[in-house]
Regions:
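Short beta-strand elements
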Residues: 2-4, 113, 217-221
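Positively charged, Gly/Ser-enriched RNA/tRNA-binding surfaces
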Residues: 9, 17-32, 39-92, 139-302
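A conserved hydrophobic position in a structured secondary element of the catalytic/binding core
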Residues: 14, 100, 252
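Short, conserved phosphate-binding/catalytic loop or strand-edge motifs used
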Residues: 58-62, 99-107
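A short, ordered amphipathic alpha-helix with a cationic face
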Residues: 93-97, 108-112, 123-125, 138-140, ...
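Short terminal or interdomain "cap/linker" segment that borders an active site or interface and mediates
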Residues: 102-136
């Protein structure tokens, strides 16, 4: 992050993303509004990257946040919206939405009675996919062999549905298994909705920020070496600003996504309504109806 000091010695930071500012606004300017609440934004954000990475440190961020909604239905709504954003702007359909859940790795590590430093080091090695160093690090820890096998194997489990099956075979307690089963349910529902070729899983996905609390995801487009879309659930963040509420959202790097756009086709926007009862069947039917020549827009349910 870019950090500065004001004349009183206080640390000032250029915003690295918009999620935290939105969480703060929910507890100030919007504190009297009823939930659930849907927001969108466009703003410049600033991040410091390693030198020679070829990445910009300032870019245009565009995103949505759903405040006050939790559970499978809401997670699916946001994931479908993310998929349709990528699909509408990339008619070649050479993109992937990679999905994970922070609770899979988090619940496993919390079971191992490790110190905070060891936890952070393990997560950092997994995040960097530094698997040889991870194996060496685990060898020096006094933990069960099944724990070591889980941590050494999980980073290799990325791809299609079969990776979920393999992860279930490694689960060493009910909490870990429950988190894997939830991700499986999300994957199968997206498959049922017709998105299987656009999605993959990463069973060890770890975000760079620590406020995520559940489903997380990243969008990639062929030929672009960076993530163009990212998001997830952050149920605990708003409580830091005074108002406890569940939340989920995502943002896109506008500049990167524009590079993947195909403007040859004019798209008519057609909103669809999805009721809560039998939502999956109804959503699937309406997606099929709009699949060929119309744009899918998810709007508020009654």
């Amino acid at each position: 992050m870019y950090k500065f000091f004001d004349r009183n010695g206080r640390i000032l930071v250029l915003r690295p993303d918009m999620t935290v500012p939105v969480a703060r606004m929910i507890n100030t300017k919007l504190k009297d509004m009823d939930l659930p609440l849907k927001l969108f934004y466009t703003a410049n954000v600033f991040r410091v990257h390693e030198s020679l990475e070829g990445k910009r440190n300032e870019y245009l961020d565009c995103g949505i946040e759903l405040i006050g909604g939790d559970g499978e239905i809401i997670d699916l709504e946001i994931l479908v919206t993310a998929l349709e954003v990528l699909k509408s702007l990339n008619t070649r359909e050479d993109f992937k939405l990679e999905i994970g859940d922070v609770n899979i790795l988090r619940s496993a590590i919390n079971e191992m009675n490790l110190g905070e430093e060891d936890k952070e080091n393990i997560i950092d090695l997994i995040n960097k996919k530094s698997l040889i160093n991870l194996k060496d690090y685990l060898e020096n820890l006094k933990i069960k062999d099944e724990y070591k096998e889980f941590l050494n194997t999980l980073p290799w489990l990325f791809g299609g549905y079969d990776m979920i099956e393999k992860a279930k075979g490694l689960a060493f307690n009910n909490r870990v298994k429950e988190n894997i089963l939830y991700l499986e349910k999300i994957f199968l529902n997206l498959k049922e909705l017709g998105y299987e070729k656009y999605i993959s899983v990463d069973m060890s996905m770890v975000p760079r920020v620590n406020y995520y609390s559940g489903i997380i995801f990243k969008g990639y487009v062929t030929g672009i070496g960076s993530t163009v879309l990212k998001g997830g659930r952050y149920n605990d963040l708003l409580e830091n600003f005074g108002r406890k509420s569940s939340a989920i959202g995502f943002s896109v790097d506008v500049n990167l996504l524009i590079n993947s756009c195909n403007y040859d086709e004019k798209i008519d926007r057609k909103p669809i309504l999805v009721e809560k009862d039998n939502y999956l069947i109804k959503l699937k039917e309406k997606i099929k109806k709009t699949r060929d020549d119309e744009y899918l827009e998810i709007v508020d349910r009654e």
